[in-house]
């Protein structure tokens, strides 16, 4: 196992798959790489838990620092709401997010409005997507959710109400 740890570790490090400070998911664990040695990687979760993971036990991993971030935002709207009114409220919210300089600087390109991506007995779902700088998808999403809530409220666009049928 020691030889396998070393060989796997060399390949991952040679391929520059992760570096100290990167946010990664390895198996069920997501955290920040704090240490890399010839035999293992140390990952700290946001709960504070520190995990030492032997290189040989890593079959796949995701690195959130490489390349780009992505926001896929779905918003459920009461099925009886006017689709055009809901779409306009979403577009107004996105325009306000894009007008915020500190947020706009985190976004690559323009947002993409997909439109209706889901339909149920109680709701339809609208989607907008953004490409962001690495690790900035959450900042963009928080700003977007705040503006969507605000603009949906201003336009009177309601979320679906859960109903229960008692038999």
Where are these regions (language model features)?
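Membrane-spanning helices that line or support transport/gating and their immediate boundary helices
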Residues: 2-13
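Solvent-exposed, non-transmembrane regulatory segments of membrane-associated proteins
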Residues: 81, 101-167
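Positions in alpha-helical segments
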Residues: 5, 71-72, 126
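Soluble accessory domains appended to multi-pass membrane transport proteins
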Residues: 11-105
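Hydrophobic face of alpha-helices
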Residues: 4, 87-91, 141, 145
């Amino acid at each position: 196992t020691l030889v396998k740890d070393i060989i796997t570790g060399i390949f991952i490090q040679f391929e520059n798959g992760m570096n100290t400070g990167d946010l990664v998911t390895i198996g069920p664990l997501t955290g920040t790489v704090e240490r890399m040695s010839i035999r293992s990687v140390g990952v700290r979760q946001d709960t504070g838990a520190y995990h030492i993971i032997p290189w040989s036990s890593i079959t796949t991993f995701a690195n959130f620092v490489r390349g780009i971030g992505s926001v896929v935002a779905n918003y459920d709207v009461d099925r009886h709401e006017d689709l055009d009114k809901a779409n306009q409220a979403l577009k107004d919210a996105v325009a306000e997010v894009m007008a915020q300089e500190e947020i706009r600087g985190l976004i690559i390109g323009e947002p993409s409005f997909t439109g209706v991506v889901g339909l149920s007995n109680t709701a339809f779902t609208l989607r907008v997507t953004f490409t962001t700088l690495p690790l900035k998808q959450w900042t963009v999403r928080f700003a977007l959710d705040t503006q969507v809530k605000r603009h949906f409220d201003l336009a009177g666009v309601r979320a679906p109400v859960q109903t229960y049928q008692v038999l």
